Amino acid sequence: MEKFKEIMDANQMRRALVRISHEILEKNKGVENLCLVGIQRRGVNLAKRIQENIEKIEGVKLPLGILDITFYRDDLSLLSEHPTVNSTRIDFDINNKKIVLVDDVLFTGRTVRAAIEALMDMGRPKMIQLAVLIDRGHRELPIRADYVGKNVPTSRKEIVHVLVDEFDNDNRVIIEQLDREI
């Protein structure tokens, strides 16, 4: 069996993000009070692409925030003694705003729970929605995405990698086959 299998190429990623952008606009009836927040790391890059798509469609550049959830993780003590902390930058008031959280892969739901907790510490949004490029299943918390690029049923012996130009000099999604369960 192959160790890596491509499940989305660059064009499929682009089309999925364009579709998600349209769905966000349709569900929210436009851009009023709408903001995007990308979850560090790759969620930020996907959020920027959604922001660009919406700007092309509506002619409006949505506010875009960057959220690091490291200190909100429920497994922080298991990660390492000195976890890598990225920056959080949300330069707009989130109170009474419709926030679309953007992440690359939805798996157990724990990252999203941490992101919601981090946002709630910053204010009281009117609504929080979730957009993900890949939903791979295996939820451990009652969390679901409002916008999904692709549902990809996986086993616990697989990891989904979303590759983006900004970090990987590539745009595609691959599944890695492991020898053990995660």
UniProtKB/Swiss-Prot annotation:
Keywords: Glycosyltransferase, RNA-binding, Transcription, Transcription regulation, Transcription termination, Transferase. It catalyses: UMP + diphosphate = 5-phospho-alpha-D-ribose 1-diphosphate + uracil. Transmembrane segments: none annotated. GO terms for biological process: DNA-templated transcription termination. One of its GO terms (molecular function) is uracil phosphoribosyltransferase activity. Belongs to the purine/pyrimidine phosphoribosyltransferase family. PyrR subfamily. NCBIfam families: PRK05205.1-1, PRK05205.1-4, PRK05205.1-5. This is Bifunctional protein PyrR. The lineage of its organism: Bacteria, Bacillati, Bacillota, Bacillota incertae sedis, Caldicellulosiruptorales. The gene is pyrR.
